[in-house]
Each structure stands twice: as C-alpha cells, then as structure tokens.
Regions:
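Conserved glycine-rich cofactor-binding loop
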Residues: 8, 15-17, 39
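Conserved glycine-rich Rossmann-like NAD(P)H-binding loop of the short-chain dehydrogenase/reductase
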Residues: 29-45
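Substrate-binding pocket helix/loop in short-chain dehydrogenase/reductase
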Residues: 70, 97-101, 105-113, 206, ...
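Active-site helix of classical SDR
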Residues: 124, 160, 168
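Alpha-helical segment proximal to the catalytic Tyr-Lys
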Residues: 129, 173-177, 238
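C-terminal helical subdomain
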Residues: 184-187, 207-236, 240, 247-249
Length: 253
C-alpha cells in the first residue's frame, strides 16, 4: 500500500529518533521527502539512505529557533518539488528537567519556547499558505504527554508543549473548511536521544525507570509514533482534525 505516492512531505527534526523513523516510513509509501534538521551530516545521511533504497529525498539544514530559516525552508521545499502536501513539525528540544519552577533557568525557558512552540507556529505560518496554493494538505505537530498532563520539574517543556496543543487546535479550526487538517501527536517516553539524556544510556536501568511510567511497562519505539503520524497525514484520517493523539502505553488514562 502506497498512501503517499508522489506526495510532498516535509519533516523537521529528521536526522534522528522519531523524525528519522517517520522519514523512512513515508519513503516506503512513495513520498517525496524534504528533510530538515540542524545536524547536516546526520540529516544528509538519512536522505542518502532513502535514496539508496530507491526513494526520493533531499536534505535542507535549518534551525527552528531562527525564523528566517523557517521561511526559507518552506520556500525551498516548494521551489524544489512544486508544492507541499504534508508537514510533520517534529523538531524539538528537552531543555531543563527535574527543576522546580522558581529555579528554571530563564535561558532554557526562552530556548524551549523559541524552538518547541514559536518554531512550530512559524512553520505553520509558512506551510499553510503553501498548502492552500495547491488545494490543501495535512499538518502533524509534535506535542508530548507533557502537553496534556502535568509533570513536576518540567515547567518550561510543559509550557512549550501545552502551547503546541493549543495552536494545533486553533489552526485546525481556522482551516477545517479549506482543505487543511492539523493534528498533534503526544508521545510518552520513546526510545531516542532525548530519553537517553533524561534517563541515561544504560538500557536496563532506562527500561526499568522509564518503562515503569507506563502501564504497558516498557518504553515506546520511534516506529510506533511514525505509524500514528502517517495515519493522521493520510486520507484514512480524512475526517480527523484538531486532535491530539496520545502514544503513551496507557500513561494518560
């Protein structure tokens, strides 16, 4: 099944983790990929692996905290492929964890909001007009379980991700009758560089600590998030918009 044959798909944060897994999943279903990340070498390697497997992908370096780079990113995608059908605004940072609100560093707060929230907002500001120009599209934003449920010691990250949920719903309602669907995914702990930074790199202790957060008693896998992103972006979810889908092993029940 090729749900995305020749569809133009832009993915930010595509050099590793969930973004990388999602890029491969879209490629397997025939998408033409425009991959974005700060890390040029890793991002180029992902694009090359897709091309080596017979897919279509180009890499574009950009920093989601730099507004001019976001506009240039979308313009470059449209110039290269002729439009934009799907956007997965996945890029994000973790910032400061296990820090009480009064002690949260201001610099970390500012950077979290700049990348995780304002970056997504600016992406949509440029992606929506590009999609309208060709009759519509689908946007999936990366939120988090920290965007729908409170966790102590994460006020900056929570603010950024609750904000993503809010702007997702607002944009979805603004364009619901104009052919653009906007949804968000809210993963819990997924095997990734971010999980390594928060829980450490020892796999056994990480599985025990992070896995215990979830009723399913394990960490999620990037492919499990990618599957949901592709469904939301596909015509199978044609009547789904303004949703926040939890991928959490039961954590939010």
């Amino acid at each position: 099944m090729s749900r995305f044959q020749n569809k133009i798909v832009l993915i930010t944060g595509a050099s590793a983790g969930i973004g990388e897994a999602t890029a491969y999943a879209f490629a397997r279903e025939g998408a033409r990929l425009f991959l974005v990340a700060r890390r040029r070498e890793q991002g180029e390697a992902v694009a090359q692996r897709i091309r080596d497997a017979g897919g279509t992908a180009v890499f574009h370096p950009a920093d989601m905290s730099q507004r001019d780079q976001i506009g240039a990113m979308v313009a470059s995608c449209v110039a290269h492929y002729g439009g934009l059908d799907v956007a997965f605004n996945n890029a994000g940072i973790d910032g400061a964890f296990n820090v009480d609100t009064p002690d949260h560093p201001e610099e970390a707060w500012d950077q979290l909001l700049a990348v995780n929230l304002t970056g997504v907002w600016f992406c949509m500001r440029h992606q929506i007009p590009a999609m309208l120009a060709t009759g519509g599209g689908s946007i999936v934003n990366m939120a988090s379980m920290a965007g729908v449920k409170g966790f102590p010691g994460s006020s900056g990250y929570a603010a950024s991700k609750f904000g993503v949920v809010g702007i997702t719903k607002a944009a979805a309602l603004e364009y619901a009758d104009r052919g653009i669907r906007v949804n968000a995914v809210c993963p819990a702990v997924i095997r990734s560089d971010m999980a390594d930074r928060v829980f450490g790199t020892d796999e056994r202790s990480k599985e025990e600590e992070a896995g215990s957060w979830h009723p399913m008693n394990r960490i999620g896998e990037p492919d499990e998030v990618a599957d949901v992103v592709l469904w939301l972006a596909s015509d199978q979810a044609s009547f789904v918009t303004a949703e926040t889908i939890k991928i959490d092993g039961g954590l939010g029940a």
